[in-house]
From Swiss-Prot:
Organism listed in the record: Rhizobium etli (strain CIAT 652)
EC nos: 3.4.25.2
Xref: Pfam families: Proteasome (PF00227)
Source species, domain of life: Bacteria
Assembly with partners or alone: A double ring-shaped homohexamer of HslV is capped on each side by a ring-shaped HslU homohexamer. The assembly of the HslU/HslV complex is dependent on binding of ATP.
Protein name: ATP-dependent protease subunit HslV
Gene field: hslV
Keyword Ligase: no
NCBIfam families documented for this protein: ATP_dep_HslV, PRK05456.1
Length: 175
C-alpha cells in the first residue's frame, strides 16, 4: 500500500507520501508520486490504495472542484456521495487525503469525509505509525514539513509497504 500524511502547523499545510508501489509482496516501483496539486494548484491531494482507482477518484475530485471552485468540503462530500452510491465507483479501493488553505479532509469509499482535530492525519498501511509519530511531534518546535518527513521515516522503518522516497507538497494556510 503506502503512507500519506498531512500536517497543519505554523502557517503551512504539508502533505507527504512515500513512493512505493507493491503488487502482492513484490515492490514494483519505488518512486511513484502519490501526492500532487490539483484544483488549479489550490489543493494538495494524496492517495493510498489501488493506484488506478486512486487516479480515477482524483479525476472525479478535480471535476467536483471545477463545479464547486474554492469549496473543498462541498466537492469532497459530493465525491463521497458518488463514490458510495455509484455502481462502478463503490468498487474502487482507495482512500484520499485532501487539503486547501483552510481545510484538511480524509475521504473514504464508505462515504466518510473526516476533518482531523489535531492538525494531522494519515492514511495507508503505515498511516497509524505516521499519525502517532506526528502527534508526538506536534508540540515540538519542528515545522510542519519536518514533522511530516520524520513521521513518514518512522512509518517506513516499521511498515514494509512504505519506503523512504518521500514527496512533499505544501500550501500557505489562512489565519
Amino acid at each position: 500500500m503506502t503512507t500519506i500524511i498531512t500536517v497543519r502547523k505554523g502557517g503551512k499545510v504539508v502533505m507527504a507520501g512515500d513512493g512505493q508501489v507493491s503488487l502482492g509482496q513484490t515492490v514494483m516501483k519505488g518512486n511513484a508520486r502519490k501526492v500532487r496539486r490539483i484544483g488549479k494548484g489550490e489543493v494538495v491531494a494524496g492517495f493510498a490504495g489501488a493506484t488506478a482507482d486512486a487516479f480515477t477518484l482524483l479525476e472525479r475530485l478535480e471535476k467536483k472542484l471545477e463545479q464547486y471552485p474554492g469549496q473543498l468540503m462541498r466537492a469532497a462530500v459530493e465525491l463521497a456521495k458518488d463514490w458510495r452510491t455509484d455502481k462502478y465507483l463503490r468498487n474502487l479501493e482507495a482512500m484520499m487525503l485532501v487539503a486547501d488553505k483552510s481545510t484538511t479532509l480524509a475521504i473514504t469509499g464508505n462515504g466518510d469525509v473526516l476533518e482531523p482535530e489535531h492538525g494531522t492525519t494519515a492514511i495507508g498501511s503505515g498511516g497509524n505509525f505516521a499519525f502517532a509519530a506526528a502527534r508526538a511531534l506536534m508540540d515540538t518546535d519542528k515545522s510542519a514539513e519536518e514533522i511530516a518527513r520524520r513521521a513518514l521515516d518512522i512509518a517506513a522503518d516499521i511498515c514494509v509497504y512504505t519506503n523512504h522516497n518521500i514527496v512533499v507538497e505544501s500550501l500557505d494556510v489562512e489565519g
